[in-house]
């Protein structure tokens, strides 16, 4: 793998986890360019279907283009088949597109999560098009080792929504304390069969206060 590709993947922390009735996707907001903080309000979670979201790590331009492409493909799927696309099918579409471009790869590492008739699920998708269904927790980016330490220690099957949001916030806070590529705030999305919701800043601050206590 080219050295410049490895360097482009060093920033960001993203987290995905399954709870009773849905999925949490969460990221921090820092975007870096080498040693410079290029943005303090970078968007790293995109809604690609009614009940499916995607997190991004890697090159911003590549990731934004992929978000546009997969959103259109998910809409076309619904129009052609008269039903919502599943999380697995959305991950497969993304995987196929990335694999077709493997000789000129998109510099990204992605999480695709949501809920469908099969229940809640999260997939990790790499730049070569490899897609893996994660059973419960997953993290990507340079801060993922710190995030995994918290997730592995505190995650339990059957967590409720409030507990899952707090765990995601706690994992990201741990990564932001030690990883230079992560910081500037937290963005959390909750996806259930009834809604796709961006968690409010007030709620995130409440959970952050619990992690400090």
Curated annotation (Swiss-Prot):
The active site lies at: 12
Q: Which reaction does it catalyse?
A: Cleavage of peptide bonds with very broad specificity
**MF (Gene Ontology):** threonine-type endopeptidase activity
EC numbers on record: 3.4.25.1
Output the Pfam families linked to this UniProt entry: Proteasome
One GO location term (cellular component): proteasome core complex, beta-subunit complex
Question: What name is this protein filed under?
Answer: Proteasome subunit beta
Q: Record the organism.
A: Methanoregula boonei (strain DSM 21154 / JCM 14090 / 6A8)
This chain is encoded by the gene named psmB
């Amino acid at each position: 793998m080219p050295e410049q590709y490895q360097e482009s993947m060093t920033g960001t922390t993203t987290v995905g986890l399954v709870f009773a009735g849905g999925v949490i996707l969460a990221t921090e907001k820092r975007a870096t360019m080498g040693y410079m903080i290029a943005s303090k309000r970078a968007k790293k979670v995109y809604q690609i279907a009614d009940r499916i979201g995607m997190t991004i790590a890697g090159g911003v331009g590549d990731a934004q283009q992929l978000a546009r492409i997969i959103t259109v493909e998910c809409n076309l799927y619904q129009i052609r088949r008269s039903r919502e696309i599943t999380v697995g099918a959305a991950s497969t579409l993304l995987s196929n597109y990335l694999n077709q471009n493997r000789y000129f790869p998109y510099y990204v590492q992605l999480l695709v999560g949501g809920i469908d008739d099969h229940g809640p699920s999260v997939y990790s998708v790499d730049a070569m098009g490899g897609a893996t269904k994660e059973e419960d927790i997953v993290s990507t980016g340079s801060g993922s080792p710190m995030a995994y330490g918290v997730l592995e220690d505190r995650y339990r099957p059957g967590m409720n929504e409030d507990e899952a949001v707090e765990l995601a916030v706690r994992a990201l806070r741990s990564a932001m304390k030690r990883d230079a590529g992560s910081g500037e705030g937290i963005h959390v999305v909750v996806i259930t069969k009834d809604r796709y919701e961006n968690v409010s800043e007030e709620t995130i601050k409440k959970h952050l206060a619990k992690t400090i206590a």
